[in-house]
A protein has these predicted regions:
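Short linear sequence motifs
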Residues: 10, 26, 73, 93, ...
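N-terminal trafficking/processing presequences and adjacent post-cleavage segments
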Residues: 7-8, 13-60
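Short amphipathic alpha-helical "recognition" segments used for binding
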Residues: 6-7, 76
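Charged, low-complexity, helix/coiled-coil-prone segments
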Residues: 25-29, 84, 113-119
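A short, surface-exposed interaction/processing loop segment used at functional sites
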Residues: 101-126
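Positively charged n-region of N-terminal signal peptides that target proteins for export
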Residues: 1-4
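Mature extracytoplasmic domains of secretory-pathway proteins
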Residues: 39-95
């Protein structure tokens, strides 16, 4: 019985860490709030973009710390800064996709703690 309890205690933290990573990873997908804000704004400016084929990838994610203490929010836990790249192709595929870099503060509980900051890094626009 003691072995079973010990095994359960060792497995539970792994499950919690796994679900935290999955929740944070969701914040980097095209379905996330930050990506949708960027995709919606880009589509409003240019209706030739194919918003359904947009892609998003994680560039960087860091825990927020002050000194050596993690910065946490009572309701949402550990806070992170996250930067993602969002690529939105054109419907006709004759032009290169529009590419954005977007950054926001997130937690495993909430992908929309701050307004997303983003800018266009499409090579022809630089």
């Amino acid at each position: 019985m003691k072995k079973l309890i010990l095994l359960a205690m060792l497995c539970v933290p792994g499950i919690a860490l796994s679900s935290t990573k999955e929740a944070l990873d969701y914040c980097a997908t095209t379905e996330s709030w930050a990506a949708q804000k960027v995709i919606d704004a880009a589509f409003e400016r240019n209706k030739q973009l194919d918003r359904m084929k947009a892609t998003s990838s994680l560039i960087e994610r860091h825990k927020l710390v002050k000194g050596k203490k993690p910065i946490t929010f009572e309701d949402w836990g550990q806070l992170y800064t996250q930067t993602i790249e969002i690529s939105i192709p054109y419907i006709d595929n004759h032009k290169k996709p529009v590419i954005f870099i977007a950054s926001s503060i997130i937690s495993a509980e909430e992908c929309s703690l701050t307004e997303v900051a983003y800018f266009d890094i499409t090579p022809e626009n630089n």
